UniProtKB/Swiss-Prot annotation:
Its EC number is 1.17.7.1. It holds the Pfam family GcpE. Belongs to the IspG family. Converts 2C-methyl-D-erythritol 2,4-cyclodiphosphate (ME-2,4cPP) into 1-hydroxy-2-methyl-2-(E)-butenyl 4-diphosphate. The gene is ispG. Binds 1 [4Fe-4S] cluster. It is an enzyme of class 1 (oxidoreductase). This is 4-hydroxy-3-methylbut-2-en-1-yl diphosphate synthase (ferredoxin). Disulfide bonds: none annotated. GO terms for molecular function: 4 iron, 4 sulfur cluster binding; 4-hydroxy-3-methylbut-2-en-1-yl diphosphate synthase activity (ferredoxin); iron ion binding.
Length: 398
């Protein structure tokens, strides 16, 4: 299929990426897009950290990240993993490592399935306020230091068959990248590519890459440029999507969706996290809703409902809530709730079941395009449930 044809195709065509195993969870274009999050408990509080990880796993997080800012935190991950396994929780664990973290990373790699590093902070030198530029020789010398520091971690992860995320943040680019490329997507991409090339030279390919920023336009440009740069250099590593520091509430969700969904629609992205300033488990439904809205994963009922107008023959908002409350535990179904006959049958043609107001006080129930029966409005929701049961597609709520 040509690029132009893909642009107008109703199916999303994912960028082809290699499979990277994070524990027993495969990440890559041949697999469903993976949902993940991060606990906000102190890693040194073993019980609280374990409880937070279990809450996230039960909410649907398929990978869980934990911060490890010190050697003590890194060692605590061993006990956390042990406690989780004793409680029957096998969710893959990721250690988040930042400032000058190679010793921490080498320790924590023994206890987790993946290590995340930040290229801008992996070798952290205090910025020199008097510096005007980096000469090519200075730039290359720091690159050599990075390689010498990074190589032991790459070798360990490769030999233990663990994974690595090269996680660039727009707000923490290294000083030499800022001087050379500016505060730009180009600087973000080169920060990542420096580490990607080292991994490739050391025959380590269990890597994922992220290009996070707090502004969606910057994040979009960085991910697109990263994908193009990898394609040009012959790399096909998976992308981890996210808008960092998105905030909370409706705006935080909208901001994250604007960035993540746009890239997913372009075919970019193999795993995602929605970062909210809220309890981490509240991030998970947003992730699954983004994926479902694009047809990339179906994990809940898809509801089709008109916005209501003067033609509506029943209280659409109230009825939709009743239908949702009765059926939201089901998976894999499309249910349409339409207020009148004008748009009803046409708009819900792709739905498995339809609930349509045709005449006052009467509901028409549909299976696909076929009208099955008419029932009094007061019996509409129960009759819909009965129709689903007749088709063998009903399960009782847990």
């Amino acid at each position: 299929m040509t690029a132009l044809a893909r642009r107008y195709d109703t199916q999303i065509h994912r960028r082809v990426t290699r499979t990277v195993m994070v524990g027993d969870v495969p990440v890559g274009s041949e697999h469903p897009i993976v949902v993940q999050s991060m606990i906000n408990e102190d890693t040194l509080d073993i019980e609280a950290a374990v409880a937070g990880i279990i809450r996230l796993a039960e909410a649907g997080s398929e990978i869980v990240r934990v911060t490890t800012p010190s050697m003590a935190h890194a060692k605590a991950m061993g006990q956390i993993r042990k406690e989780l396994r004793q409680r029957g929780c096998s969710v893959p664990l990721v250690a988040d490592v930042h400032h000058n973290g190679v010793k921490i990373a080498l320790e924590v790699a023994q206890h987790v399935d993946k290590v995340r590093i930040n290229p801008g902070l992996f070798i952290f030198d205090k910025p020199d306020p008097n510096r005007q530029e980096f000469s090519p020789e200075e730039f290359a010398a720091i690159g050599q230091r990075i390689r010498e520091t990074f190589e032991p971690l790459v070798t360990l992860l490769r030999d233990q068959n663990k994974a690595l995320r090269i996680g660039v943040n727009h707000g923490s680019l290294a000083e030499r990248m800022l001087f050379t490329y500016g505060d730009t997507p180009e600087g973000m991409v080169e920060s990542a590519m420096e580490f990607v090339r080292i991994c490739h030279e050391l025959d380590f390919h269990n890597i994922l890459i992220s290009m996070k920023a707090s502004r969606a336009p910057v994040m979009l440009a960085a991910y697109r440029l990263m994908a193009d740069t990898m394609d040009k250099e012959g790399f096909n590593y998976p992308l981890h999507l996210g808008v960092t520091e998105a905030g909370d509430g409706d705006y935080g969700r909208i901001k994250s969706t604007a960035g993540i969904a746009t890239l997913l629609a372009d075919g970019l992205g193999d795993t995602l996290r929605v970062s909210l300033t809220e309890a981490p488990e509240k991030e998970i439904p947003v992730c699954y809703s983004i994926l479902q809205s694009l047809g990339l994963r179906k994990t809940m009922v898809e509801y089709v409902a008109c916005p209501s107008c003067g033609r509506t023959l029943f209280n659409l908002e109230e009825v939709l809530h009743k239908v949702r409350n009765a059926t939201s535990h089901l998976t894999g179904l499309d249910i349409a709730v339409m207020g009148c006959i004008v748009n009803g049958p046409g708009e819900m043609a792709d739905a498995d079941y339809g609930y349509v107001g045709k005449t006052p006080g009467v509901i028409s129930l549909y299976r696909g395009r076929d009208e099955i029966r008419k029932v009094p409005e007061a019996e509409g929701v129960e009759a819909l449930i009965q129709l689903i049961k007749e088709d063998g597609r009903w399960v009782e709520p847990a």
